[in-house]
């Protein structure tokens, strides 16, 4: 089976730049684990409602929101942030 490749959107990179360095290192380490997995979806949870089709991954108190392109074996990083506000932040991006 092929490994997935993680692709960061500009917004995802902006989100990471707002986080503490130690948190960013933990998130990047987790992303590497996803890339090396044959089936990274098992580590996450599929979202519903206005985020249907997207997946979220828990990294301590932080979350990353992603979209899978299965035919290309890619995971697109859409948003990253604290669990308290990540869903509100991403919902606002969907409205724009």
In which residue ranges do the predicted regions lie?
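Enriched for short, Lys/Arg-rich terminal
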Residues: 1-5, 14, 62, 67-96
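Arg/Lys-rich, positively charged N-terminal/basic patches that mediate binding to nucleic acids
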Residues: 1-29
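Residues that form or immediately flank small-molecule/cofactor binding pockets and catalytic motifs
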Residues: 11, 52, 82
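A short, surface-exposed loop/turn module that caps and links secondary-structure elements
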Residues: 32-56
């Amino acid at each position: 089976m092929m490994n997935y490749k993680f692709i960061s959107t500009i917004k995802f990179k902006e989100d990471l730049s707002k986080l503490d360095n130690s948190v960013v290192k933990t998130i990047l380490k987790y992303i590497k684990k996803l890339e090396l997995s044959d089936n990274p979806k098992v580590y996450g949870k599929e979202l519903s409602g206005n985020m249907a089709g997207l997946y979220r991954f828990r990294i301590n108190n932080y979350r990353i929101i992603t979209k899978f392109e299965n035919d290309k074996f890619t995971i697109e990083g859409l948003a990253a942030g604290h669990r308290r506000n990540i869903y509100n932040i991403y919902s606002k991006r969907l409205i724009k």
